[in-house]
Amino acid sequence: MKCQFFFFFSLFFLLQPVKGEMDSNRQLFQVYADSIKITVSCLNDQIIHVQATPEGSVGKESLVALKNHALKPTFCSVQKNEEGISMLTSKLTISYSTTDKCISFTDRISGELLLKEKMRDFVRQHIGEEDVWNIRQVFSLTPEEAIYGLGQYQEGVMNYRGKKVKLLQANKDIVNPFLISTRSYGILWDNYSKTLFEDNEHGATFWSEVADEINYYFIAGDNMDKVIANYHALTGKVPMFPKSAFGYWQSKERYKSFDELTEVVAEYRRRQIPLDNIVQDWEYWGDRPFWNSLKFDTLHFNHPKEAIDCLHDQYHVKLMLSVWPGFGKETDIYRAMDSAGVLFDEPTWAGYKVMDVYNPKAREIFWSYLQKGLFDKGVDAWWMDATEPSFRDGAIQEKQEERSKSAGPTYIGSFHRYLSVYSLFMSEMMYNNLRMQNDKRVFILTRSAFAGQQRYGTAIWSGDITARWDVFRHQISGGLNICMTGIPYWTTDAGAFSVTGKDSEFKQGLADPAYRKFYLRWFQQNAFSPIFRAHGTSVPREVWQFGQPGDSIYEGLLK
């Protein structure tokens, strides 16, 4: 099938003759065909930026590519030929054909065709109070190659050949629109709206709901690891975590006082079981009207500075604290946010209101309250929960999409356009503010992610999953795929978050010997995950809850 441009207008557009413009100084060329401007830019010898922009549209600045990247080709030449226009680097040949109006990417050294466009189309729509394009780009893949990445999903898919996936954020689903091939190239699809990917007999297709243009990066490498290295060069390198982040994280939903939390740490030390981090989950702020007040409840979490100093000085353990993007109506920060007009008026499952993190004023207010109420008390690491952001029914992709879109426009545009990047903005806010305070390395755990988020010192986990063997198995493919998108730090709730719920295989929890064996296997798997962490609800996760010295499960957890 030839590359075609489909337009659904009420007006008729005259097709322009194909013409080309080349600029070797800027390492790019542009061609104009069928009212589309196609721009091909050489960022380095293995990273090529492709934009296809309809007449009258203007693309927006990328949120994922670094604004001041140091990318530069060692060699780039642009030339016309009988077939069209070619761009040569030391590693690649990028060709535009005037016959089918498609771009192909070839390994210049071996002469092997790596990837070829097949078709693209644009459909005019009115979405989110603006006139936008639905966009579609189809690529031709070779029969033998496998493709990975795209994020973390719960279907148990490893290789996306012949598969369809919805790139939508949800409680247990994480989006990163970066695809990587066993033929040592990747495609970074630079769009933040609802996106679908499908590979079938017609080709490999990216489709997005809201766009001004088709915008993607072709990223090659000498091997798959080098492809990811080039992805990091484009979107940001991964900062080094503090050494403690690579130790064991003890967590559960939840410790109800500093006394309980400190007793758990003391018991780990008494039993001489290694522990580097203790985690305080939600409701340290008190009841629901005080949701995420960004300060400690004075009844059960009194004298926080002294309590945290004790964890540091006496037990040599670090504290991670859960913070959310929404606030209860009885909190000071809610009143400040409401007065500034930076809260979304969309109902949530716990009655809080979510802030518009895209608004600089919201980010300023959030940090000012967090710094005074929590950071200055000595908290070491930050668990940013529900950063999809969570409204209601957040475990279901379509419901999460619906609630987000109905929340109204964001500061920078419609939620339809910026559907998937809430967590990227949250992470940027936290990381940049933390780095301005001191020279300590940053650790942020967040439930959602997007391309480029790795540059903000974040790890991710797979959400509120259920205790079943098939769910456990699906975490392996989900974790491997998200890590192959260049986000290397990922983990799960050891033993699953929900153990006694209706969908669990182990409704008796700890009373079921089968669950204790199940937990052991998952705990062992987490020991070899990038982040070694236990967490969940209903069933406590301290090692001694599963047996005593001499018991097979207890001893297995320690070995």
Map each language-model feature to its residues:
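Aromatic- and carboxylate-enriched substrate-binding clefts and catalytic-loop regions
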Residues: S62, P274-L558
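N-terminal accessory segment at the very beginning of proteins
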Residues: C3, P17-T235, P239-S244, S251-E253, ...
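Enrichment for repetitive, rod-forming helical segments
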Residues: F9-L11, P143, Q454
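N-terminal small/glycine-rich loop or linker at the start of catalytic domains
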Residues: P239-S251, D345-V354
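Sec-dependent N-terminal signal peptides
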Residues: Q4-L14
